[in-house]
C-alpha cells in the first residue's frame, strides 16, 4: 500500500490550492477594477439607468414616457404587417425549390421502374429495344420523376416502347413466315397458297398501320409533356432565383435594417427619458435647497430683530434721574459711536445678501453639463426617429410588393402559355390520326 502513496505530498496540494486562490483573487481584482473604470463613465452609468427605467416601464411603475409621433407608430404597425405577409408568401413559394412538389413519390411506380431498368443487367446479356428507344428519345430516366408532366411523359415513352417491341416482333414473325413459304417444294402448293398469302398481307398491313398510329399517339403525347416539364423546370428556376431571392433579401436585409433602426430609437428614447428624469430631480432638489436657505435667513432676521428690540427696551428702563445730566452730556458721543458700529439688523441683512449672492453666483441649470447632455440625447432621439421613419416609408411602399407579385404572375403566364401551346399542338396531331 505504501507504494501507491509514495508520490503523495501534502505540501504540494497546499501549494496548488494557494496558487489557485491567488489567481482567482487576481482575476476578481482585475474584474472589479474594470468594473469601477466602466462605472465611472457617464455613458455607462446612463446605460445602466436606462435599463433600469426599461424594467420600470415594463412593470408600469413609470408614467412619464416620451410619446413617439403618430406617423412613426403607424409605420411600425404597417412594417410589422408587411413583414408577416412576406414571410407567409415565402413559406408557400419555397415549394418551388422542392423537386417533384406536384407529384408525390409513388413507391410502386418507383420500384417498377427500378426493376425494369436493372433486370436486363442481372438476368441477361442483351439490352431490350425499349431501353435503346428511351436513350434515343432524349428522355431523362430519373429514378423519381421531378414533376407530374415528366411522369406522364415517361409513362407515354414506356407505352410507345411497348408497341414498338410488339411491332418489331410481328415483323420478325412475318419475315420468318414468308421465308418458310418461299422454300416450299412444289410449285402447285405455292400457286394454291398465293391468294391466301395476299389476304394475310393485307391483314398484316392493317395491323401494322394500327400499331404505327398507336406509336405516333404515345410519341406525340410524350413529346408534349416533355416540353411542358422543361418549361416547368425553367419556371421553377426563375421563381427560386428571382422571386424567392428578392423576398429573402427583403426579409433578411431590409426589414432587419428597420428593426435595427427601431431599436436605436427605443434606446435613444430610454436614455433621453432617463436623463430628463435626472435633470428634473436635480432641479427639484435645488429648488428645495433654495427654499430652505431662504427660510433659514428669514428666521434669523426675525430673531435678530427681536433681540434688538429687547435690548433697546432694557436701555430705556435702567437710567435714573440722577444720571440724566451726565448721560445727556455723553449722548452725542454714544450716538456717534452707534452710528459707526454695525447693528444686529445690519449683520443679518448682510448675511442674507451674501447668501443670495452665492445662490446667484451658481451656474444656471440650462448651462450645466446635465442639460448639455440632455440636449444631445434629444437631438439623437429626433435624428434616429427621422431615419427610421424614412426607411420604413421606403420599405412599406406598395410598389415593392406590387412588383414582386407581377413578377410571379409573369413567370406563371409564360409557363401556362407554353402548356396551352403544347396541348393544342398535341391535339392537332391526335385529330389527324385515324385509328
Swiss-Prot record:
<feature type="compositionally biased region" description="Acidic residues">
    <location>
        <begin position="195"/>
        <end position="210"/>
    </location>
</feature>
<dbReference type="InterPro" id="IPR018859">
    <property type="entry name" value="BAR_dom-cont"/>
</dbReference>
<dbReference type="Pfam" id="PF10455">
    <property type="entry name" value="BAR_2"/>
</dbReference>
<feature type="compositionally biased region" description="Basic and acidic residues">
    <location>
        <begin position="322"/>
        <end position="340"/>
    </location>
</feature>
<dbReference type="InterPro" id="IPR027267">
    <property type="entry name" value="AH/BAR_dom_sf"/>
</dbReference>
<feature type="modified residue" description="Phosphoserine">
    <location>
        <position position="47"/>
    </location>
</feature>
<feature type="compositionally biased region" description="Basic and acidic residues">
    <location>
        <begin position="290"/>
        <end position="304"/>
    </location>
</feature>
<dbReference type="GO" id="GO:0005737">
    <property type="term" value="C:cytoplasm"/>
</dbReference>
<protein>
    <recommendedName>
        <fullName>Uncharacterized protein YPR148C</fullName>
    </recommendedName>
</protein>
<keyword id="KW-0597">Phosphoprotein</keyword>
<feature type="region of interest" description="Disordered">
    <location>
        <begin position="174"/>
        <end position="210"/>
    </location>
</feature>
<keyword id="KW-0963">Cytoplasm</keyword>
<feature type="compositionally biased region" description="Basic and acidic residues">
    <location>
        <begin position="347"/>
        <end position="361"/>
    </location>
</feature>
<feature type="compositionally biased region" description="Polar residues">
    <location>
        <begin position="308"/>
        <end position="318"/>
    </location>
</feature>
<feature type="region of interest" description="Disordered">
    <location>
        <begin position="290"/>
        <end position="372"/>
    </location>
</feature>
Amino acid at each position: 500500500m505504501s507504494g501507491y502513496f509514495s508520490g503523495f505530498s501534502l505540501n504540494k496540494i497546499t501549494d496548488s490550492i494557494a496558487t489557485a486562490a491567488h489567481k482567482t483573487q487576481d482575476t476578481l481584482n482585475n474584474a472589479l477594477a474594470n468594473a469601477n473604470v466602466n462605472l465611472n463613465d457617464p455613458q455607462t452609468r446612463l446605460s445602466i439607468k436606462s435599463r433600469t427605467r426599461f424594467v420600470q416601464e415594463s412593470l408600469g411603475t413609470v408614467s412619464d414616457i416620451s410619446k413617439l409621433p403618430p406617423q412613426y407608430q403607424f409605420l411600425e404597425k404597417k412594417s410589422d404587417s408587411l413583414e408577416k405577409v412576406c414571410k407567409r408568401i415565402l413559406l408557400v413559394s419555397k415549394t418551388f425549390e422542392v423537386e417533384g412538389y406536384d407529384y408525390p413519390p409513388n413507391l410502386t411506380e418507383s420500384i417498377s421502374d427500378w426493376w425494369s431498368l436493372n433486370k436486363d443487367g442481372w438476368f441477361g446479356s442483351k439490352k431490350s429495344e425499349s431501353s435503346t428507344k428511351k436513350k434515343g428519345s432524349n428522355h431523362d430516366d430519373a429514378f423519381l420523376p421531378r414533376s407530374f408532366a415528366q411522369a406522364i411523359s415517361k409513362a407515354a415513352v414506356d407505352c410507345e416502347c411497348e408497341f414498338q417491341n410488339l411491332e418489331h416482333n410481328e415483323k420478325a414473325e412475318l419475315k420468318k413466315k414468308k421465308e418458310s413459304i418461299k422454300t416450299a417444294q412444289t410449285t402447285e402448293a405455292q400457286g394454291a397458297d398465293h391468294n391466301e398469302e395476299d389476304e394475310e398481307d393485307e391483314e398484316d398491313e392493317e395491323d401494322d398501320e394500327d400499331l404505327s398510329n398507336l406509336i405516333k399517339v404515345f410519341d406525340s403525347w410524350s413529346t408534349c409533356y416533355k416540353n411542358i416539364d422543361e418549361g416547368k423546370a425553367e419556371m421553377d428556376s426563375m421563381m427560386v432565383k428571382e422571386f424567392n431571392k428578392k423576398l429573402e433579401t427583403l426579409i433578411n436585409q431590409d426589414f432587419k435594417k428597420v428593426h435595427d433602426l427601431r431599436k436605436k430609437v427605443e434606446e435613444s428614447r430610454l436614455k433621453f427619458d432617463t436623463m430628463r428624469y435626472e435633470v428634473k430631480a436635480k432641479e427639484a432638489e435645488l429648488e428645495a435647497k433654495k427654499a430652505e436657505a431662504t427660510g433659514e435667513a428669514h428666521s434669523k432676521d426675525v430673531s435678530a430683530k427681536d433681540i434688538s428690540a429687547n435690548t433697546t427696551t432694557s436701555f430705556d428702563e435702567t437710567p435714573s434721574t440722577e444720571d440724566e445730566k451726565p448721560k445727556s452730556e455723553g449722548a452725542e458721543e454714544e450716538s456717534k459711536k452707534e452710528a459707526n458700529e454695525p447693528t444686529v439688523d445690519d449683520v443679518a441683512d448682510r448675511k442674507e445678501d451674501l447668501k443670495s449672492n452665492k445662490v446667484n453666483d451658481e451656474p444656471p441649470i440650462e448651462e450645466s453639463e446635465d442639460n448639455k447632455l440632455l440636449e444631445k440625447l434629444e437631438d439623437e432621439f429626433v435624428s434616429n426617429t427621422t431615419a427610421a421613419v424614412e426607411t420604413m416609408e421606403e420599405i412599406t411602399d406598395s410598389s415593392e410588393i406590387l412588383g414582386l407579385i407581377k413578377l410571379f404572375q409573369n413567370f406563371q403566364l409564360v409557363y401556362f402559355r407554353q402548356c396551352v401551346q403544347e396541348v393544342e399542338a398535341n391535339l392537332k396531331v391526335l385529330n389527324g390520326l385515324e385509328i
